[in-house]
Amino acid sequence: MFEHIKAAPADPILGLGEAFKSETRENKINLGIGVYKDAQGTTPIMHAVKEAEKRLFDKEKTKNYLTIDGIADYNEQTKALLFGKDSEVIQSNRARTVQSLGGTGALRIAAEFIKRQTKAQNVWISTPTWPNHNAIFNAVGMTIREYRYYDAERKALDWEHLLEDLSQASEGDVVLLHGCCHNPTGIDPTPEQWQELAALSAKNGWLPLFDFAYQGLANGLDEDAYGLRAFAANHKELLVASSFSKNFGLYNERVGAFTLVAENAEIASTSLTQVKSIIRTLYSNPASHGGATVATVLNDAQLRQEWENELTEMRERIKKMRHLFVQLLKEYGAEQDFSFIIEQNGMFSFSGLTGEQVDRLKNEFAIYAVRSGRINVAGITEDNIRYLCESIVKVL
């Protein structure tokens, strides 16, 4: 039976990482996969995380299964981080959160819930977007509709066409929004634009789904939640798929969450039973360690402050690299204006490089990036940035 199976295409991002591992040139640089790198080019374990793990090791008494929805304290802390602990959504008990297997797992739960429990047929996804968005919703049989997001000429948000496309979204359609640090462009709506989108959504009856994987890496924990909280303020229903992979550095622990907001507490609780039914058929229950680590940090004032300080350092290092990157490209003779990179948020930048230029960077200089031109700014260090900029100028 299996002899008829054809090979699946390699994932465009994860496949790049495999190619990078086999690269033998000493000056190689990986700007592809989305993990944070520190000034030394490593993906460190945060100090607050390591201390929390030590505490867990000392007090852990069992390896028993978690419940289907995961660690209750983790779920409560996640809601507070998303909406603010004093938000109406939390005070009225309209939100339910379950621990998931990373942000990807949360998105799959969302897709399954929408398909099984609502009448929604269409999901509107920005173009460009993270490639797995389309794959996840195709897997559950939903119809993908695209809305324009990026203006390639201006290297900016294509606001006019975004509104034009989303004005066609019907009542009950799902609209997928990147909460902050849009992947791959790094371009986010302004607070005023978020408010306009929230008003349009409420007026037209969309079901908003936020992919929120980078909270704290744009401008701050509360600042980055502005868009989500604007929607929560005027929507009876919305969904959130969030992750602690990036802002806690817990990539291989697969620590995510799916959050559902309903009109009232009773509907929220009933909906949660269906979410748990979905989880039971997918993976039964989540792993403990990552969620317990996050809950330990967020529950302890000292550890939480240390984590927030470390997160600020990460955010500021990325911003510093953006400025230095633009400065050195100019110094090395780039005729194009790359200043737009400074205005982008988070780990990623849509650099403006073409697929052919990206291929040359890999083949001639051992610099790996996604062919769309997306680069991981967090992969740039003071040790590799001059070689990087010099190489880019040579392929322009």
Swiss-Prot record:
Keyword terms: Aminotransferase, Cytoplasm, Pyridoxal phosphate, Transferase
Record-level GO cellular component terms: cytosol
Essential cofactor(s): pyridoxal 5'-phosphate
Residues given in the record as L-aspartate binding sites: G34, W130, N183, R374
Domain of life: Bacteria
One Pfam family here: Aminotran_1_2
Molecular function as annotated in GO: identical protein binding; L-aspartate:2-oxoglutarate aminotransferase activity; L-tyrosine-2-oxoglutarate transaminase activity; pyridoxal phosphate binding
Cited NCBIfam families: PRK09257.1
Family: Belongs to the class-I pyridoxal-phosphate-dependent aminotransferase family.
PANTHER family hit by this protein: ASPARTATE AMINOTRANSFERASE, ASPARTATE AMINOTRANSFERASE, MITOCHONDRIAL
Subunit structure: Homodimer.
Name of the protein described by the UniProt record: Aspartate aminotransferase
Gene behind the chain: aspC
